[in-house]
């Protein structure tokens, strides 16, 4: 073992020891499924892998949004057991304003979030994974946190929001060094929508979470494609939330209106780029969004997600039996595709 490896190993042991001392975290036919009265029986052997599952460190509040009470790992495990979910990959909930403020305060908040998530993963290694947060508009801070998250915390991937609330979307050229590093690491990037401050008043009395949240996913993916990020870093695996939001519905219009001067970024056409992305099904298993997604994207790209705890798990699983998926497709959605992305989650069952 080289000197650098020894340092990384020692750093990780010291980190876990210090956290322990703090005590932060003590396809079947549809008719064969049961998803009533708060119960879901997975088709996949070993149960579901939930890639859209939010944690909330102590002191980080939703300001009235989401389900009541402080999140705990035990709370999630209780719900996971109830719905046949064996593993959940944790990511930060709607708290971008705490971690994207582009200051040392934001860097410190990100570190707190990631160490909390890593402690949960360490305490329950067969129940939790981690998408580490980064202070996205802060390029230097993000690069340092990526190194810490991968080399010390051993995260499964990186979680970002669809914008930084300062007028920048993920494809912004100023963020190129971050994508370069994520590409070098062949990172799995989980992208969650977050409504920017510019767009909170577009709904005339209705919450922006009613519809704007799904437009944000489309906006962010568009920025990544038209600015060549996904073209330059093909080894990055990008996961989008909520069955892609409005992306599958607008894919035809996007193809017809794609800027000709940026055709070099889509050598096989726009739809080919959209089909490469991964899509979790959280709170988007109604027949309408699912029909749009499955008309364009192959089953190899579907992932199971719940958006717990801001959303009840029932809002996702109760609709799955009515989609008429085959056993093979259900198994891919519930577990097999995630096992392919995250080989360490292939636990014996």
Name what the model sees in each region.
Residues 2-47, 51, 59-87, 115-123, ...:
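Mid-to-C-terminal alpha-helical segments outside catalytic/metal-binding sites
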Residues 49-53, 88-90, 130-132, 158-160, ...:
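Hydrophobic faces of well-ordered beta-strands that scaffold small-molecule active sites
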Residues 54, 194-195, 244, 309:
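Catalytic metal-binding/acid-base residues of hydrolase active sites
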Residues 234-269:
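Aromatic-lined glycan-binding groove of carbohydrate-active enzymes
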């Amino acid at each position: 073992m080289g000197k650098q490896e020894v340092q990384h190993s020692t750093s990780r042991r010291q980190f876990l020891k210090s956290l322990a001392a703090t005590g932060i975290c003590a396809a079947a036919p549809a008719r064969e499924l049961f998803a009533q009265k708060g119960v879901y029986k997975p088709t996949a052997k070993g149960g579901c892998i939930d890639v859209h599952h939010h944690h909330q460190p102590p002191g980080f509040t939703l300001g009235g949004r989401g389900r009541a009470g402080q999140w705990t790992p035990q709370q999630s495990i209780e719900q996971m057991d109830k719905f046949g979910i064996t593993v959940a990959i944790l990511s930060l909930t709607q708290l971008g304003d705490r971690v994207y403020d582009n200051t040392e305060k934001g860097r410190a908040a990100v570190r707190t979030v990631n160490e909390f998530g890593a402690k949960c993963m360490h305490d329950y290694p067969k129940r939790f994974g981690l998408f580490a947060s980064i202070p996205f508009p802060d390029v230097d801070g993000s690069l340092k946190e990526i190194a810490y998250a991968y080399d010390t915390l051993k995260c499964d991937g990186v979680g970002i929001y669809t914008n930084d609330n300062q007028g920048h979307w993920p494809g912004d050229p100023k963020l190129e060094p971050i994508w370069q590093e994520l590409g070098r690491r062949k990172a799995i990037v989980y992208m969650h929508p977050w409504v920017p401050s510019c767009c909170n008043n577009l709904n005339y009395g209705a919450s922006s979470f009613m519809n704007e949240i799904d437009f944000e996913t489309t906006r962010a993916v568009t920025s990544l494609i038209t600015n060549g990020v996904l073209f330059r870093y093909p080894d990055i695996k990008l996961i989008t939330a909520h069955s892609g939001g409005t992306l599958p519905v607008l894919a035809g219009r996007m193809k017809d209106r794609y800027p000709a001067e940026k055709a070099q970024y889509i050598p096989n056409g726009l739809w080919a780029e959209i089909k490469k992305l991964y899509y979790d099904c959280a709170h988007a298993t109604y027949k309408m969004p699912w029909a749009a997604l499955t008309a364009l994207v192959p089953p190899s790209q579907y992932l199971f997600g719940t958006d717990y705890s801001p959303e009840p798990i029932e809002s996702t699983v109760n609709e799955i039996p009515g989609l008429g998926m085959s056993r093979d497709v259900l198994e891919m959605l519930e577990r097999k595709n995630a096992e392919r992305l995250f080989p360490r989650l292939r636990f014996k069952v």
